[in-house]
Swiss-Prot record:
The gene is tagH. It is a peripheral membrane protein. Pfam families: ABC_tran (PF00005). ATP binds at G57, I58, N59, G60, S61, G62, K63, S64. InterPro entries: AAA+_ATPase (IPR003593), ABC_transporter-like_ATP-bd (IPR003439), ABC_transporter-like_CS (IPR017871), ABC_transpr_TagH-like (IPR015860), Bact_Polysacc_Export_ATP-bd (IPR050683), P-loop_NTPase (IPR027417). Residues 24-243 form the ABC transporter domain. This is Teichoic acids export ATP-binding protein TagH. Part of the ABC transporter complex TagGH involved in teichoic acids export. Responsible for energy coupling to the transport system. It is found in: Cell membrane. One of its GO terms (cellular component) is plasma membrane. It comes from Staphylococcus epidermidis (strain ATCC 35984 / DSM 28319 / BCRC 17069 / CCUG 31568 / BM 3577 / RP62A). Gene3D superfamilies: P-loop containing nucleotide triphosphate hydrolases (3.40.50.300). Its main location: membrane.
């Protein structure tokens, strides 16, 4: 299978400032030291055509940062990411403007993707029908629930038929009927040998849908490989983690976060 996405030593860091004074000092003094937070640290993996990669990890591990970088909405601090094909990101609010109506968002987002108005007009009825939003499609998106936003975003991105699809928790909201319809559509993409990155806390969906697993912990790639090799390790970790008290879970998260801060 051909390589669709290649990620080499991908790192995303954020300078942490306590106040505006620290921010100004950092801008004026090149060697000024401040805390740096590593959202992602030296992540490398390769995805091939037909791969369905589940990005798993507890909240705050760096899954969404990685998915946004694959989608192109976040630039890396260092490292490289090479994409062979068009990418669409399906997240609850990805690329939606709250001031615009559903129809206007469809037009705007597809224009940004490079579609011509004639093509948009042709695809518009299909997108609206798939979204199941009815008359709400003519209302401003700021009035939408999270489930309605997810429906609109999914309908746009799935209809444009991308080569690489990134799904970030978009199936965690909304009604079960629509979720199943989305899963059926995703299975069509899987059968067509598209590359899919699937961010989810739903282990059942991950097990049924994915072929490979990338386990992110504390901004680092802890494990990456075939589903049957990595998922049992992650499930064992989750079982142990969930047995901890809330205080112990908090302590575990705090230790992970502390390891991601560096003064430089």
């Amino acid at each position: 299978m051909s390589v669709s996405v290649n990620i080499e030593n991908l790192t995303k860091e954020y300078r942490i400032y306590r106040n505006n004074k620290d921010r100004i000092k950092d801008a004026l003094i090149p060697k000024n030291k401040n805390k740096t937070f590593y959202a992602l640290d030296n992540v490398s993996l390769t995805a091939h055509e037909g791969d369905v990669i589940g990005l798993v990890g507890i909240n705050g591990s760096g899954k969404s940062t990685l998915s946004n970088m694959i989608g192109g909405s976040i630039s890396p601090s260092s490292g490289e990411i090479t994409r062979h094909g068009d990418v669409s990101v399906i997240a609850i609010n990805a690329g939606l403007n709250g001031q615009l109506t559903g129809v206007e968002n469809i037009e705007f987002k597809m224009l940004c993707m490079g579609f011509k108005r004639k093509e948009i007009k042709k695809l518009m009825p299909e997108i609206i029908e798939f979204s199941e939003l009815g008359e709400f499609i003519y209302q401003p998106v700021k009035k939408y629930s999270s489930g309605m936003r997810a429906k609109l975003g999914f309908s746009i991105n799935i209809t444009v038929n991308p080569d690489i699809l990134v799904i970030d928790e978009a199936l965690s909201v909304g009604d079960q009927t629509f979720t199943q319809k989305c899963l059926d559509k995703i299975y069509e993409f899987k059968a067509a040998k598209k590359t899919i990155f699937f961010v989810s806390h739903n282990i059942r969906q991950v097990r049924e849908f994915c072929t490979k697993i990338a386990w992110i912990e504390g901004g680092k790639l802890k494990e990456f490989g075939e589903l049957e090799e990595v998922l049992p390790d992650y499930e064992a970790f989750l079982k142990t983690f969930k047995k901890k008290s809330k205080a112990e879970q908090k302590e575990f998260r705090n230790k992970l976060d502390e390891s991601r801060f560096v003064v430089k």
